[in-house]
């Protein structure tokens, strides 16, 4: 019983916390200071540096922000659109896998002059996306299961 109660509380917390995270951070991409904050990450990334050249900093930040906000909205749509929520969760998994790749491409993610690699403040900021990636995969799985249940009851 306690386990089920924790599950019933924990899963919505994961889902809506994930959605809120994406909506909030996505909205910030429309602020000039956030454009400056993501500059070192996108400049060092092979994928994003190309997009940066084509779109410029402001447009790239807005595309990223809009993507994050749409993804967060889809995740939150789970009660009435579980398939859309699953799509949003899978999109979020892609977002967080991409940001985790910045650990490999951003020199500022690691402290220099150490015997073994140690995360810098930027690296610590990025490594939390492992948890968000896991949350995205869990919410995708649950939404897909809910979608199947919905389909089987409507047949």
Where would I find each of the regions flagged by the language model?
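Membrane-interface extramembranous regions
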Residues: 1-155
């Amino acid at each position: 019983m306690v386990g089920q109660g924790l599950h019933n509380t924990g899963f919505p917390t994961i889902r809506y916390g994930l959605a809120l995270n994406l909506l909030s951070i996505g909205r910030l991409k429309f602020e000039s200071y956030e454009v400056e904050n993501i500059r070192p990450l996108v400049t060092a990334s092979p994928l994003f540096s190309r997009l940066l050249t084509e779109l410029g900093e402001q447009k790239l930040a807005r595309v990223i922000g809009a993507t994050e906000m749409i993804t967060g909205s889809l995740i939150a749509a789970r009660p009435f659109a579980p398939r859309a929520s699953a799509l949003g969760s899978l999109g979020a998994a892609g977002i967080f896998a991409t940001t985790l790749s910045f650990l490999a491409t951003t020199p500022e993610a690691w402290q220099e002059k150490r015997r073994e690699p140690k995360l810098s403040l930027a690296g610590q900021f990025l490594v939390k996306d492992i948890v968000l990636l896991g949350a995205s995969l869990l919410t995708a799985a649950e939404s897909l299961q809910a979608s199947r249940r919905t389909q089987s009851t409507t047949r």
